[in-house]
Amino acid sequence: MQSNSLLSLLFLHFGLGLAFHQHVKQGGETNATLSVYGANSTDWPIAYGLDDGLLYIAEDPSNSDANLTPLTWDLASITGECWIANATFANGTSAGSMYIMPEDDYAVGVLPMTRIAYVNGTVSGFALFASQLVYNNNTLLEAQFWARSTSFTGVYGLTWTLDDSTPSGDFPVVIKATEKS
């Protein structure tokens, strides 16, 4: 009888502990690398195209033939208020914010905030859901990123595809963030 009472108290203690346990929200990340996972790219970083300001999935983010350079990112969490993904060059200079440009087959690029309005791009709505980069399209979280072939081996352009439309790339990709230590 005493063991049943003890067991009941133990379960009650465990149940109350679970009920009052505070969940820790997943925070954003700073100084993170965005890596891409897809059919032809596993853990390839996203690089910046110095010629056009667009983002590329590259086996080598410093690919000089494609004129690419690596970036680090400051990324908000979906529980945060500022859903903007800001990029920084390796030398510490701000590159700008991630944007989607409808006029360029929904290419994804980086520009300073002041210039994004002139190219009619979408800059807000990018955040992390756990470690995956998503886009908030009117309260729907979407991850519709695609890789598009380029003329360089091991380099794909990063694009966005709207719901119910023909994909604007060769294969879908998932983008995940990892913080550098």
Task: Give, region by region, the residue ranges found by the protein language model.
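Short, well-structured hydrophobic secondary-structure segments
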Residues: 49, 57-104
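Aromatic-enriched hydrophobic runs in primary sequence
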Residues: 3, 95-97, 126-127, 145
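Extracellular glycan/ECM-engagement signal in secreted proteins
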Residues: 20-54, 110-181
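Fungal secretory targeting signals
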Residues: 1-23
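Low-complexity intrinsically disordered segments
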Residues: 96-118
